[in-house]
Amino acid sequence: MASVHGITVKNAQGEDTPLSNYQGKVLIIVNVASQCGLTNSNYNQFKELLDVYKKDGLEVLAFPCNQFGGQEPSCEIDIAAFVADKFKFEPTLFQKIDVNGDNTAPLYKFLKQEKGGFLVDAIKWNFTKFLVGRDGHVIKRFSPTTEPKDMKKDIEAALQAKL
């Protein structure tokens, strides 16, 4: 697999979605959970980032995951409704996946190969963020505690790179 563009994932409705649909875009790929202490700040700041940078080609791809403290027990429809209602935000939401272990989604295998974590490659918690360039390669991996607003400099650099 040369880039994320060679991977197909399932959207929140369960339909195959090739990530090649996002070729030429800068992506934030993030594992999300509705009942996490990091939920509010991340969703609010993702919305703010998209309000500013979507016109330049930024997309946030949110992958619900229930592997950390069981903090995403809901189905995709309920997750989308929760985020839209509470945050007035409609991220591009995909089907719930595993990001670690035997059933790790192919996308997350690729992301972790491209940018391993500190000490271990495993995703450590909800809201681990990967910034992916227009070419489909991971530019940087951000820890769960990194706030989206603190990614601005890297996002702007990625948006300016016309690969």
UniProtKB/Swiss-Prot annotation:
Its EC number(s): 1.11.1.9
Q: Which PROSITE patterns match?
A: GLUTATHIONE_PEROXID_1, GLUTATHIONE_PEROXID_2, GLUTATHIONE_PEROXID_3
What CDD domains does the entry give? GSH_Peroxidase
Keyword Cytoplasm set for record: yes
Where is the catalytic site? Answer: 36
The molecular function terms of the Gene Ontology recorded here are:
glutathione peroxidase activity; peroxidase activity
- Kindly list the cysteine pairs connected by disulfide bridges: none
Q: Where in the cell is it found?
A: Cytoplasm
Reaction(s) catalysed by this chain's protein: 2 glutathione + H2O2 = glutathione disulfide + 2 H2O
The Gene Ontology CC terms held by the record are: cytoplasm
Keywords, sorted A to Z: Cytoplasm, Oxidoreductase, Peroxidase
UniProt xrefs under InterPro entries: Glutathione_peroxidase (IPR000889), GPX_AS (IPR029759), GPX_CS (IPR029760), Thioredoxin-like_sf (IPR036249)
Domain of life, per the record?
A: Eukaryota
Is Oxidoreductase there in the keyword field?
Answer: yes
One GO BP: response to oxidative stress
The family assignment reads: Belongs to the glutathione peroxidase family.
Protein function? May constitute a glutathione peroxidase-like protective system against oxidative stresses.
Q: What is this protein called?
A: Glutathione peroxidase 2
To which species is this protein native? Caenorhabditis elegans
